[in-house]
From Swiss-Prot:
It holds the Pfam family PGK. SUPFAM superfamilies: Phosphoglycerate kinase. This is Phosphoglycerate kinase. InterPro entries: Phosphoglycerate_kinase, Phosphoglycerate_kinase_CS, Phosphoglycerate_kinase_N, Phosphoglycerate_kinase_sf. It catalyses: (2R)-3-phosphoglycerate + ATP = (2R)-3-phospho-glyceroyl phosphate + ADP. Pathway: Carbohydrate degradation; glycolysis; pyruvate from D-glyceraldehyde 3-phosphate: step 2/5.
Length: 391
């Protein structure tokens, strides 16, 4: 991937517009998890240290496009950014007509999704954004898979377009994990539905040595292996597809192992007692809510032997401690492994936080959908735009 990097450009005295991914959880007007904001700090500080006037933009939530709604305002993000940077970050509501921040200052534009045409990558809006800056920096890996005005269109018309520190680091890490991995390559894909990750599973089954599936996804594979899943979440219409994926992985010399034991409950509830069962002993009224201890041990062995680990999604309902042991044990196995490890996806990040292993994962991706699309082998529109502006 050839693209301009922010670090290659003289930013002194320049108006620098940075697209970040500040789509963070907010409650009662306060940011409840600032991981994505912290991840952007090196890029912002680099621009400030280089003598730029810094303008930041992001989306937050899913407001009705073209309409201001206070619940989706970027104000809580501006407040948290001010605290983290140790300097004022001014929230600017009306900026399309022009914004002229002073060198050394930071402004945060109001939610880009309040602008009509943002999601459709409207050319007029993209040109308005481009006119605000001398240098456009795309730093939001989490939205790199969307061709929108603030992530794609603006970069086509800005005088200079480049990748920020975070985006460049993301792309370098993902390239290392998937394009030239140290073997064995082990991928962990969790989540509730095969349907939402079918392309990822298909793509990974072609390249990995072991593809560990967890969550509701695993239930469909358990069913495909001929076992009962009781009243667990699974997709009947994708059982044949799961079987095909297992056979395809085997044909390539890899495997998609099926759990040998699981942790079940009768209801999906925080107070529900957990019971370990062999995968052959699932009752009609059981719900599979985690992988069992023997399965965890086997999967941890795969991870221990790995040269590269890609982790996307928990393997159980880790929000409930009694159904979180599988995710905890695999997380610790990754943390203790000598492999190059990359993890991504919202639930994965929450699990990493819960078990306190962030500093022992080689690289934590800030992307959810973008991380998945990269795993699928798709070209991300924002990256394609940066490559086209590399000259």
């Amino acid at each position: 991937m050839a693209f301009k990097r922010m670090t290659d450009i003289d930013l002194a005295g320049k108006r620098v517009l940075i697209r970040e991914d500040f789509n963070v959880p907010v409650k009662d007007g306060r940011v409840t998890s600032d991981a994505r904001i912290r991840a952007a700090l090196p890029t912002i500080r680099h621009a400030l240290d280089a003598g730029a006037a810094v303008m930041l933009m992001s989306h937050l939530g899913r407001p009705t496009e073209g309409e201001y709604a206070e619940e989706f305002s970027m104000k809580p993000v501006a407040d948290r950014l001010s605290e983290l940077l140790g300097q004022p970050v001014t929230l600017v509501k009306d900026y399309l007509g022009g914004a002229d921040p002073a060198v050394g200052s930071v402004v945060l534009f109001e939610n880009v999704r309040f602008n009509k045409g943002e999601k459709k990558d409207d050319e007029v809006l993209a040109r308005q954004l481009a006119a605000l800056c001398d240098v456009y920096v795309m730093d939001a890996f989490g939205t790199a898979h969307r061709a929108e005005a603030s992530t794609h269109g603006v970069g086509k018309y800005a005088p200079t377009a480049c990748a920020g520190l975070l985006l460049a680091t993301e792309l370098d890490a993902l390239g290392r994990a998937l394009h030239d991995p140290a073997r064995p390559l082990v991928a962990i894909v969790g989540g509730s539905k095969v349907s939402t990750k079918l392309t990822v599973l298909d793509s990974l089954s072609q390249v990995v040595d072991q593809l560990i599936v967890g969550g509701g996804i695993a239930n469909t594979f358990i069913k495909a292996a001929g076992f009962n899943v009781g009243k667990s979440l699974y997709e009947e219409d994708l059982v044949a597809e799961a079987r095909r994926l297992m056979e395809a992985a085997k044909a390539k010399g890899g495997e998609i192992p099926v759990p040998v034991d699981v942790v079940v409950g009768k209801r999906f509830d925080a107070a529900e007692p957990a019971m370990v069962k062999s995968v052959a002993d699932i009752a009609e009224d059981d719900m599979i809510l985690d992988i069992g201890p023997e399965t965890s041990r086997r999967y941890a062995e795969f991870i221990g032997r790995a040269g590269t680990v890609v982790w996307n999604g928990p393997v159980g309902v880790f929000e409930f401690d009694q159904f979180g042991e599988g995710t905890r044990r695999l997380g610790l196995a990754i943390a203790e492994s000598h492999a190059f490890s990359i993890a991504g996806g919202g639930d994965t990040l929450a699990a990493i936080d819960k078990y306190g292993i962030a500093d022992r994962i080689s690289y934590i991706s800030t992307g959810g959908g973008a991380f998945l699309e990269f795993l699928e082998g798709k070209q991300l529109p924002a990256v394609a735009m940066l490559e086209s502006r590399a000259d």
